[in-house]
Amino acid sequence: MKGLSSLINRKKDRNDSHLDEIENGVNATEFNSIEMEEQGKKSDFDLSHLEYGPGSLIPNDNNEEVPDLLDEAMQDAKEADESERGMPLMTALKTYPKAAAWSLLVSTTLIQEGYDTAILGAFYALPVFQKKYGSLNSNTGDYEISVSWQIGLCLCYMAGEIVGLQVTGPSVDYMGNRYTLIMALFFLAAFIFILYFCKSLGMIAVGQALCGMPWGCFQCLTVSYASEICPLALRYYLTTYSNLCWTFGQLFAAGIMKNSQNKYANSELGYKLPFALQWIWPLPLAVGIFLAPESPWWLVKKGRIDQARRSLERILSGKGPEKELLVSMELDKIKTTIEKEQKMSDEGTYWDCVKDGINRRRTRIACLCWIGQCSCGASLIGYSTYFYEKAGVSTDTAFTFSIIQYCLGIAATFVSWWASKYCGRFDLYAFGLAFQAIMFFIIGGLGCSDTHGAKMGSGALLMVVAFFYNLGIAPVVFCLVSEMPSSRLRTKTIILARNAYNVIQVVVTVLIMYQLNSEKWNWGAKSGFFWGGFCLATLAWAVVDLPETAGRTFIEINELFRLGVPARKFKSTKVDPFAAAKAAAAEINVKDPKEDLETSVVDEGRSTPSVVNK
């Protein structure tokens, strides 16, 4: 907090010393934006992340004072940046409790998606559901849902999610985050009626497709809303909370399905009740989101400055003159950043995400990060109850295993929060993949034996897989996909990455259905060999292409990508992006990023606008 206090004190001094000039002078915000905009057009430096400037700077008529004013702005930015980066978790929670609470509320919408997708997979192991909608397997004498219908139902909700993701963008532009989420919750509550009163698998398919659209909305806005209202110190915790919500939803589904198996095994309530319980969520969440503050970034983009100020007053804690200064500085930061983005270019298109080498690299990493959640075999966990039955355990025991599995997933996410203080993003991602690969190979080996002990062992090891998945790749991905894109293309990159995940998930789901269904490949636990191999392939990509972003601010990540730093050198490379900004503003000679990487040095008293390896 020392840097923040220093920044506030200098803000007070500057306001006092320039009182007369404020009355008669020129507002330099526009001047500085124009100066930096012109230089930005000549260089690759991303000015959109100069977010911590104090706002209006008041130069006199002598333009020679502009560099001094810019130096002061850069110093303010650097101190605020360092203050947030070094802020401990508990300090951040005490300083920004309301921002954290609102972010947690919005992210809770993901519980519904985790819940519904989990119960769909569990229904395939529920006898009453199998008998009503399945067909008799002449080989086993049991009823089963055909592979084609299992694939079709999965495709329906994934198609709905893809449509929902694409609709979310223009909807947010028109009505904002809050009302888009409330509208999605309203439609979800309406679409649940189709599932509850279903008479055929066709009705379930329609209901899943329609419910998928609001789920797609939740996937995008939970991450973007958290990143816009919360400070850097809480970034990892609040973005990975999305994974925790997913796991909570899956845990609720497992508990409810076990209850259905025990009490309603031969009644339609066995599958209708789990559908009906989805109505619990939309109303209280809609009320909470209605009471939540709108993103101040969206309000400023729409020119609603007074509303943005009131939103910041609700987000930031504290009271008195200090809070007023914090609100003013934050508002100036948002206004200046948006002004620069609007002057430098348009909002950005999907083509911009892949047009140039830098953004193409960032988009590729974001997409492959999320695809890694599919290619590592984690989708097998979603069909754990079905998997356990095929491994030879009873239906009741299968649901018990699922509950234990999701409890381990929740515990693993909390362990991930603790481990993030000592390990980087890449470390957790790679660690999780390596241990998953080992566990899958062991599961595959056990699948070669037909003994009861081997079948029970394979089911138990799948719970271990769930633990390492939720310790490593599952939570880290939500943080990485918010860190990889540039500010201007963040929402569109997240949408592309999630849709890449959805497309690959379709392929993975088809493979799993064929692997587990007794009428098709009937691999059972032997499928562990297949997914263990894909875990190793995903790990190989991560070693080559996934950079380490832990402890890096967005402006530092921008500079590292601009300079083309190799993925494995992100962690050991020092950057001074504020020196780069000052150099751009002063119109010094702009060098090629590769030349910066080779020739830059950091002296005791000053640093060049690029990098030095430790």
UniProtKB/Swiss-Prot annotation:
Q: Which UniProt keywords apply?
A: Maltose metabolism, Membrane, Sugar transport, Transmembrane, Transmembrane helix, Transport
Q: Which domain of life is it from?
A: Eukaryota
Protein name according to UniProt: Maltose permease MAL61
What's a GO biological-process term for it?
Answer: maltose metabolic process
* Gene Ontology terms: cellular component: plasma membrane
The places in or outside the cell where this protein is found are: Membrane
Q: What's the chief localization of this chain? A: membrane
